């Protein structure tokens, strides 16, 4: 039986009217297409990174997916329903975490916030206890469950936000900048939780972030949006392999030499007997470069770096700006 998509957007568009003052009295209006003819299918169990530069259309798309904004064009269905017409029904089936907004009660202990959310989402006491027992262990919440939310550190609060979004066992989890401002330990805890959630329970994850390490550690698929249009969509390794056409080789030679000149490479720097070369793999291969160096001189040691995900994404942004 064919799987139905969790998110199905067809020709999705959102147009905003921007008013600008022209002189003391007159105003001019400009129409801005924030999202333009976007087609997106996300299937159950996928963990998808949704990335793009500021103003690319990420937040607008997320707001249409969650029923906050009305599309100007196209159709959107989430879990088989219209998010705008059946927003309350959708709310009980998805979890949402926005790094800059809270769904917790600031004056209440964290545990009390979870209890209130149980009633709002109409979760049975037994199901809630089972979920919370797992989440408390996964996110290491036990030491601050009785602490008022306003007294929590940013990292503690974000772990609490993630638990709050997951306590009702959503089929789809949407996260917008969940690790913004967090220390390394808290970031690692959030990423580990998202991986385990996806792998253990098959929860579909849609993650937007500017921290590309989040994408690299959590997501198997990347969708890149720019100027409201999807410019890349595919498995993360494929994206890196296809667009990461440059690698860096470091060679340590038996003697100090002038910069090596090898076809298909650019000499980056020399430090004593070590030299770094950037390899353009559209022109040559790492094996051919190493063989060419070996014909010129003796090699003591070498290392070869894989394409950097940050560089790949910057290349995508630059090509579509």
Language-model regions: role of each:
Residues 115, 119, 127-144:
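Conserved ABC ATPase "signature" region
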Residues 173-177:
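Catalytic Walker B motif of ABC-type/P-loop ATPase nucleotide-binding domains
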